[in-house]
Curated annotation (Swiss-Prot):
Matches recorded under Pfam families: LplA-B_cat
Organism of derivation: Clostridium kluyveri (strain ATCC 8527 / DSM 555 / NBRC 12016 / NCIMB 10680 / K1)
Enzyme class: transferase
Annotated positions binding substrate: 77-84, 144-146, 157-159
Residue stretches making up the BPL/LPL catalytic domain: 32-213
UniProt keyword terms in alphabetical order: Acyltransferase, Cytoplasm, Transferase
PROSITE patterns on file: BPL_LPL_CATALYTIC, LIPB
Highest taxon, organism lineage: Bacteria
Any one GO cellular component localisation term in the record: cytoplasm
Protein name (Swiss-Prot/TrEMBL): Octanoyltransferase
SUPFAM superfamilies in UniProt: Class II aaRS and biotin synthetases
UniProt subcellular location: Cytoplasm
Family of the protein in this entry: Belongs to the LipB family.
């Protein structure tokens, strides 16, 4: 059985901190030839521009971004423009696909399946939309996916809306798609618990990738012994 480590962060993480954490985890996976590390967190409000994105899909002025304390960052992930913020669970799987299957399209479908299964556990009919990535409920996207892969090790990942401020999505053209909107779990289910979503994501991750997940205390001990500090102060 494969073995991955999972690190949950319990405070809001800036996007730049998230990039730094991913790079540390990426280097750790290479150096120790482990199967992977799953990072789970919530970001401080940020608009990110992927490789295929452009500022033409940002509708907000600098004044508006400053008013709402929203950062703007270019990123190496695939995809267009998206928003991250509180009430949205972001997952960064740093997986060594050399130990799984070296197939980028399969990897994307596996991420979609994790998210679809999780959303459906709340009684919500979620699925994919032909020609588009991510997970959808009707014509509204509930979870986005954007990845990067180097040396067959993955970076970036997915974001699932739980109780995110959807007004902030009005500041952009999400993923460059004008004709469709976004939604959150809370639109369909009252009182969704963030930690419950985390647990469901972890369970589906284990099932889809056929791996054990080693939890936080062991992870911190392992990283500290290896001089890898993923703690945010």
């Amino acid at each position: 059985m494969r073995k991955c480590y999972v690190k949950e962060f319990h405070k809001l993480i800036s996007y730049s901190e998230g990039i730094e954490i991913q790079q540390k985890a990426f280097d750790f996976v290479i150096r120790n030839n482990i199967d992977g590390i799953l990072l789970l967190l919530q970001h401080k409000p940020v608009i990110t521009i992927g490789k295929s994105g452009g500022k033409n899909n940002i509708l907000a002025s600098k004044y508006e971004l400053d008013k709402y304390s929203i950062d703007l960052c270019h990123t190496s992930r695939g995809g267009n423009v998206t928003y991250h913020g509180p009430g949205q669970l972001v997952g960064y799987p740093i997986l060594n696909l050399n130990n799984f299957q070296k197939d980028i399209h399969l990897y994307l479908r596996q991420l979609e399946l994790i998210l679809i299964n999780t959303v459906r556990e709340y009684g919500i009919k979620a699925g994919i939309k032909p020609k588009y990535t991510g997970v959808w409920v009707g014509d509204r996207k509930i979870a986005a996916i954007g990845v990067g892969i180097r040396k067959w090790i993955t970076r970036h990942g997915f974001a699932i809306n739980i109780s995110v401020n959807k007004e902030h999505f009005k500041l952009i053209v999400p993923c460059g798609i004008k004709e469709f909107g976004v939604c959150s779990l809370e639109d369909f289910t009252a009182n969704v618990d963030y930690n419950d979503v985390v647990q469901k994501i972890e369970n589906n991750f284990k099932m889809i990738f056929e791996t054990d997940l080693i939890k936080e205390e062991t992870v911190d001990n392992l990283f500290e012994r290896s001089n890898l500090n993923l703690r945010i102060t």
